[in-house]
Every structure is written in C-alpha cells, then in structure tokens.
UniProtKB/Swiss-Prot annotation:
Gene Ontology CC terms: mitochondrial inner membrane; mitochondrion; respiratory chain complex I
Enzymatic reactions: a ubiquinone + NADH + 5 H(+)(in) = a ubiquinol + NAD(+) + 4 H(+)(out)
Keywords for this protein: Alzheimer disease, Amyloidosis, Disease variant, Electron transport, Leber hereditary optic neuropathy, Leigh syndrome, Membrane, Mitochondrion, Mitochondrion inner membrane, NAD, Neurodegeneration, Primary mitochondrial disease, Respiratory chain, Translocase, Transmembrane, Transmembrane helix, Transport, Ubiquinone
PANTHER family for this protein: NADH-UBIQUINONE OXIDOREDUCTASE CHAIN 2
Protein known as: NADH-ubiquinone oxidoreductase chain 2
EC number per UniProt: 7.1.1.2
Domain of life assignment: Eukaryota
Record field: transmembrane: 13-33, 56-76, 96-116, 123-143, 149-169, 178-198, 201-221, 247-267, 274-294, 326-346
Organism from which the protein derives: Homo sapiens (Human)
Amino acid sequence: MNPLAQPVIYSTIFAGTLITALSSHWFFTWVGLEMNMLAFIPVLTKKMNPRSTEAAIKYFLTQATASMILLMAILFNNMLSGQWTMTNTTNQYSSLMIMMAMAMKLGMAPFHFWVPEVTQGTPLTSGLLLLTWQKLAPISIMYQISPSLNVSLLLTLSILSIMAGSWGGLNQTQLRKILAYSSITHMGWMMAVLPYNPNMTILNLTIYIILTTTAFLLLNLNSSTTTLLLSRTWNKLTWLTPLIPSTLLSLGGLPPLTGFLPKWAIIEEFTKNNSLIIPTIMATITLLNLYFYLRLIYSTSITLLPMSNNVKMKWQFEHTKPTPFLPTLIALTTLLLPISPFMLMIL
C-alpha cells in the first residue's frame, strides 16, 4: 500500500464508522457503511498476493450483498411509513431484512462462511481490524433498532453462531481462522442479549475488542500464524510464554479472568428474564472453545521446537518490536473482573 494513501484510507474508514454510529437517518447510515466497506478493501490487500486478492473479493461480494438487502429494507420501510428515522422501523418485513443484512455484515451464522476465509487471507493487522473495528458500525445499527427486532429470530441466529464458531474452530491449525471462529462465537453472545439489555451488548463488545486486540498483538509480536509456529515462543520470546495462555483463557471466558465477565453478566440477564434453557445451551456449547484454546496453550507453553543449544537463548539479543499499548491491554485482559460490580452498576 502506498504510504501516502494510508492516512486517507484509514480516515475514511474512521469517518464511515462514525457517520453510521452517530446517524439516526437511514440514508446517512447506509452511506457510512458504504464508505467503510470501500475504504477497507485496500487494507485487506495491503500485501498484494492472490490470497489477499481473493479475500478482498469475498469480502466485497458479501458486504455488497448485505448493503443491497439493507437498502431494499430501508426503501420498503420508507414506502410504508414515510419515515427515514431509524427508531421508526416498525414494519416487520423491513426489520427482518435489516437483521439479515446485519447478520451478513457481522459474520453471524448461517452467513459466517466468509469470515474465516477473509481473515486467513489477510495479514494479522488487517485481520485485527476486520474482527474488531469493522463490527462497530453494524452493531451500532442493531443497538438503535433493538426495540423492533424479532427476538426469536435473533436468538436462533445467536445460538447458530455459537455452534458454528465453537465447532468450526476444533480442527483448525491456522491461528487467524481460530480467532475468526472465536469472533463468530462472541457475536452470538452479543446479539443474544441485545433484545433484553442493549447496554450489555456494548459491554460485551468492549471487552471482546480488548481481548481480541491483545491476542492479535501478541501473535504479531511472535510472528505466529500456525499452531506449529507457536511452539517456538519459548526459544524466540520467552516473556510471551505466560502472556499468550492467559490471553487465550480470557478469550475462552475462564474465571477469574476478564473474559468471564460478559458471559457471567449475560447469563444473569437471561436468568432475570426467566430464561434458563437458552443460556445453558449457549454456555455448554461455548465450552468447545476452551478445547481449541487449550490446544494453543499446549503448543505455546509445553511444546518446544527442536533447536540447537547455541540459538536457544537468542531471544535475549533480538531487537523486539515496540509495544507501547501491550502492557495496558494485558492488564485489562486479565485483571478487569474485580471491578465488574462497578461496571454492572453503571449499566
């Protein structure tokens, strides 16, 4: 990517997300989504090769299809109600079409097939933006129209997403695909609680972004893209050996780490609404995520690649990449649970 074009591209992505998140008019919301989508394609093709080009085409086709469905739903709602305001989305069919479009943009099941492929075909930094920043605009739309959502359909999509994300990651060896399937599972949890408590979705999204950002930065620091390459962590960067497992366990939602907080709060929210079966199913299926996280932890902390003695301590002399935000992110990833009563009180 041309260095001169980078500020324009990233500022357009930021502006598109901001327009969508702050707008209450359907037309400007759609324009913001389109700005965001078109500006993000060069980010996916940062390294020009056939795999990244294929990933960009898959991303464009999926997002363009979702945008067409969204535009059709907006026009249909305007024909029936004469309103462009997002809070006046009262027509049932328009609401269903908007939900389908946002499910495609978020990568929820059964529209999730593009997420692992696109994430795998891009560099780690582009994959990080795809799985974090690109979720903000669709979730802001879902947040604004949450009173008019079809609860049964949304819960069905959420459970399907949790199932697809948990089972899809079981036989993977590529770290980017594993994190993509983890993202699908987290999307299921976020959308499940949206009709009951939209603010809980925002809390879940915030913690998800912190955890995923930490995981991607650690893997990028280690230059690891497969489970086999994780085995060289001890020889290459020994100080990462305890950090990667703790981050992965937090992503899996294991107490007493930060990742347990959103799951605990969501299960409590369902219990308050006298719904016990759905959170039980969600929590049980999500346990499969812990299995493939434990596989990664095994590769990181227990398995060692065969290396000669003269390079075993090479990490002491390597010039590591600057990581100004990593200590703060690691602290938030592991130590946020004790202040959870304060956070839940705000909600």
